[in-house]
Regions:
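N-terminal metal-binding scaffold of metallo-dependent hydrolase/deaminase domains
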Residues: 1-47
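Glycine- and other small-residue-rich loops at beta-strand/loop junctions that grip anionic moieties
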Residues: 81-82, 108, 168-171
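A short, local hydrophobic-aromatic micro-motif
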Residues: 4, 16, 28, 69, ...
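Intrinsically disordered, low-complexity terminal tails and inter-domain linkers enriched
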Residues: 32-57, 128-145
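Divalent metal-dependent hydrolysis catalytic cores, especially in the metallo-beta-lactamase
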Residues: 74, 90-122, 146-159, 185
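Charged helix-capping and loop-helix junction motifs
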Residues: 85-88, 119-122, 175-177
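Metal-coordinating catalytic core of metallo-dependent amide/deamination hydrolases
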Residues: 124-185
Length: 185
């Protein structure tokens, strides 16, 4: 796929007009539009630059930036991460992807180890389902979803003095063994 005329965020921390070539869901080449003109002047055809059977998107007036990572969210679209079903986690991830977020680290609240374990179990099931769908590249469901890349354990290991919305009943000092048990789920 070729994305033409996009305003691309560069390593110089500014936007420049460029063409982006994508193969197998990976960016393989970014060509400043001036270079595209130089290729044309050098006698290179569109076929030399990208495959003809590849779709082309004109991104004139649009910006292309790296996918964003949401490192602290408690939910979205009416669903709370801690109480969501696996299907509701998918809805949260769909919403995030629709808004430019390609990866999420949802945050926990302060709960008992049992409840936190159930949260971890649902997150694991979502992650496995998401990974299998990506590997199969299923055409049945081509819905974009943010990848769950971790869990932000905001609670229960948080300061009682700065508890905010956390339930003080479950706030406790850091417990490495409890964390490991939750991590292994």
């Amino acid at each position: 796929m070729q994305i033409k005329n996009a305003m691309v965020y560069t390593k110089d921390h500014k936007f420049e007009k460029a063409d982006i070539q994508v193969e197998d869901e990976h960016i393989i080449k970014i060509t400043p539009c001036e270079s595209s003109m130089q290729e044309k002047a050098a006698g290179l055809s569109a076929a030399d630059v990208h495959r003809e059977d590849s779709p082309e998107i004109d991104a004139e007036g649009l910006y292309a930036i790296p996918g964003l990572v949401d490192i602290h969210l408690h939910g979205a679209v009416g669903h709370d991460f801690c109480t969501a079903t696996v299907d509701e986690l998918e809805k949260i991830a769909e919403y995030e992807a629709e808004h430019g977020i390609f990866a999420i680290c949802p945050a926990t609240m302060s709960y008992s180890e049992e409840i936190l374990g159930n949260i971890m179990d649902k997150a694991r099931i979502y992650k496995q389902r998401h990974d299998v769908a990506n590997q199969m590249q299923s055409t049945e469901d081509d819905t974009m979803r943010a990848d769950l890349v971790g869990i932000h354990m905001e609670g229960p290991f948080i300061s009682r003095k700065k508890a905010g919305a956390q339930n003080p009943e479950y706030i406790q000092p850091a417990d490495v063994e409890m964390f490991r048990r939750l991590q292994e789920r």
